[in-house]
């Protein structure tokens, strides 16, 4: 009888990536098949996030529901991973004794052994250690699920912003070797992936070892990824302003595969608050980065993260944030009310901004950025946009949907054979969360790089010397 696995994932794209790797790993080692129905599962895994306080409380609420399933099926194994698991450790089992396996973001590759331990001894296991890069060496080969894919290139963060738990839950920065990353992306490209999104908590701090013992910078990695045959779009998230160096900006100047969209968190427009957050940059320095980016790529759109109601934030501080929002003209944002996280320096600061004031500031900020996003969308009407077709439209299965470089969803009429390929569409209408397009040309009418085999490369590069002997010059 086939064993079933149900995974619930909360949090960032890195968690989504980790969950997909867990599913692949357990399919290869134990034959588990994914199910969307928890009641069918033999193994329940919860991949958690501890960035927000509410997300942490949601963990124990869901575990209360899963406890009822375990009472009906004592053989059911329940595992909790991710940042809450890393932060809580053994204390998690004290609040939720139904949990059998507790693992951190850096130990998910040990899940098969942990599950075997539980099955063999009927006792729980906890492993929230930080074995650095080991997890990537023990994960199965990548498996494409559509034309886009996430690839983790580094983990952890050394910045220790006063509000953030990431350095404590995912450890300090560790970069994967560049050759491993390029090989994984080449494997995905061979399976039809056209767009790759490079992941890391502080992705532009990447410094990976090369095969010859040198160090590959993030800018160098971007160019190498863009050169992989079949990869026509490159994205990355999430980056930090103090690591956004001029050599990265130069890649925007000369590498068209790198999309004209950047998520660059700033958190606040007040230098005083930025100092209290230990962000190590000013609002003016952030604006200077954006100015240089727009010189290199005039059509680039910027999104960001904001925290409102940070301890000590005054009305003047908030107004400086709103001024930055207007100056940069952000496209989208992920904005939140400050939530103190246990163990972080900011948690010890007096939280002297009222809840009512926090909610009002958040509403003003989100409303302004939504207005700016709509202005940008309206300016796209009449333009031709290259869209990567991801599948059928959510609202009408007779239509197709894809994404522009600046991450707008476009719905248009087309044929199923366009899925997984690029098309050019003219934008003709704007809606709250999508655009309407008319198909202009398909991929076979574009000058994109074709997939090449070793034989085609040899044939293309073959030359003959003076006596007619074939030589090859790659």
From Swiss-Prot:
Domain TRAM: 378-441
Cofactor: how bound: Binds 2 [4Fe-4S] clusters. One cluster is coordinated with 3 cysteines and an exchangeable S-adenosyl-L-methionine.
Keywords on record: 4Fe-4S, Cytoplasm, Iron, Iron-sulfur, Metal-binding, S-adenosyl-L-methionine, Transferase, tRNA processing
Binding site for [4Fe-4S] cluster 2: 157, 161, 164
Top-rank lineage group of the source organism: Bacteria
GO biological process: tRNA methylthiolation
Name of the protein described by the UniProt record: tRNA-2-methylthio-N(6)-dimethylallyladenosine synthase
